[in-house]
Amino acid sequence: VEPIKKGLDQVLKGASVVLFALLVVIVVWQVFTRQVLNSPSAWTEELARYTFVWVGLFATALVFSERGHIAVDFVVDKFSPRVQKVVAVCVQLSIILFALAVLVYGGLRAANGAWNQSLSALPTQVGVMYLAMPIVGVLIAFYAVYHLQAVLRGAEEAIAHEEDPQVV
């Protein structure tokens, strides 16, 4: 499972970098055509919006991969290691449920419902753009299962702590 996770991490990192670079180019082109040419490009705003959404969702999956999401753990830190493990299992199960129910199922329904709707400025359907949700839902569910099994077998701490905490 570890090689699959590392491979997915690399693909997500690469896709995020490419999409972010594309987003920068799109926005620069949009500003250039609007301010310099006085003829704003019709497609840039729509493409920038959807590119931003895809970058944000892919980055969310990467954060789940690294267990870097926000966690309020000051209460859980007070519990015994056994209770911390139970809480961690419940959290990962909740993440799996949310990812599958909302992102995968809901995302597929949204994509299916919008499949015949065309974007106004781009030659594609809205449903294609909505496919980011189920894709990211599957990735988040995979990462949650990965962390769940790692916590259960003791390979990861029940609560993810910063490796190098910064005290301000």
PLM regions and their residue ranges:
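Alpha-helical transmembrane segments and membrane-interface helix-loop junctions
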Residues: 1-168
